[in-house]
Amino acid sequence: MTNVVVVGSQWGDEGKGKIVDWLSERADIVVRYQGGHNAGHTLVIDGTSYKLSLLPSGVVRPGKMAVIGNGVVVDPHALIAEIGRLEAQGVTVTPDNLRIADNATLILSLHRELDAMREDAASNSGTKIGTTRRGIGPAYEDKVGRRAIRVMDLADLDSLAGKVDRILTHHNALRRGLGVAEVSHQTIMDELTSIADRVLPFRDTVWLFLDKERRKGSRILFEGAQGSLLDIDHGTYPFVTSSNTVAGQAAAGSGMGPGSLGYILGITKAYTTRVGEGPFPTELKDAIGEFLGEKGHEFGVVTGRKRRCGWFDAALVRQSIATNGITGIALTKLDVLDGLEELKICVGYMLDGEQIDHLPASQGAQARVEPVYITLEGWKESTVGARSWADLPAQAIKYVRQVEELIGAPVALLSTSPERDDTILVTDPFED
């Protein structure tokens, strides 16, 4: 038995929700360890759809413990609203099935406002990142700047006032520079005191809780958000998120040591998508790109934004295999490729006349690379709902085997529809 870390191996939207839900049935505890409410997913359980963006997937399954780790930035209003939506669907959320790290950073209204103001200003100059405007980046900035308000601060109103003064010294200076009104001390104090009683019951010393559970032999599933190519260090900077999204963050963002992580499962879409700005070497701006987007329902859960679509990029996924230490992948949305006469896979790039096998870190170089493709025969038969290799067309199996060879990692799970049971299990990550 081992613990499992789930990471996206591309730019997010790889289908982590279904796989995490499938794995969470086998887990005792599901832990979010980075990001905020900027990446959503939909779970379908017994015909009911649950849309989650901040809460770990385990919260909707009876008998499971959901944990929000210290690496997550928590918008308390988004948290309360999401709990309310789940309760309206009959899901009970209490400290018996949700814990939040007392040292997790809070997202405040001033973070959301700053995020939006920066994006608006950048839009006018053509340099926008394409954030969700939910305050994620500014909250992480305050965390690193040692001025953040954390969950535990809600329990100590005597010291909270001084911490609010500290954060406002920084933010009001920025607001003056941007030509907008300053935020008053009382506004932030009222904002925090109004939600304290709703958030504090979930507060816990999460690293200690998880350590005790690990020693008891509990199965722990670490649920990543976004994808490895959006990592603040290893992604396509500056078109990235504001946290580390690679598997190593599961240790830092939960308070558990790296030796506790176990199997690293990389969720990998059978083609490539990206939402927002940034380089995308295999992007298809033609009828095939439209086909993938429409058949794959490629619209963001949180923002509703249309995703850009392209061919599978083995060079990029190979990088993610390395930066995450991925043990095996879950290949998703194979069924979206049904009906295409031929398929292409990117195996490397041409950069200034030279072939390279990885995407360079330089923003300028990323903009100049041209993909190098191999072409495979497609298949006409349907793969929808396949639950064994015998159900797959020969060419689909060949495609999967080619992906394995090019990325240097085996397929542990193969998903053939949004339904959780339409999954071919090759290796159970918890039993590895």
From Swiss-Prot:
Mg(2+) binds at D13, G40. It is an enzyme of class 6 (ligase). It catalyses: IMP + L-aspartate + GTP = N(6)-(1,2-dicarboxyethyl)-AMP + GDP + phosphate + 2 H(+). The gene is purA. Binds 1 Mg(2+) ion per subunit. This is Adenylosuccinate synthetase. It is found in: Cytoplasm. It comes from Rhizobium leguminosarum bv. trifolii (strain WSM2304). SUPFAM superfamilies: P-loop containing nucleoside triphosphate hydrolases. Its main location: cytoplasm. Its cofactor is Mg(2+).
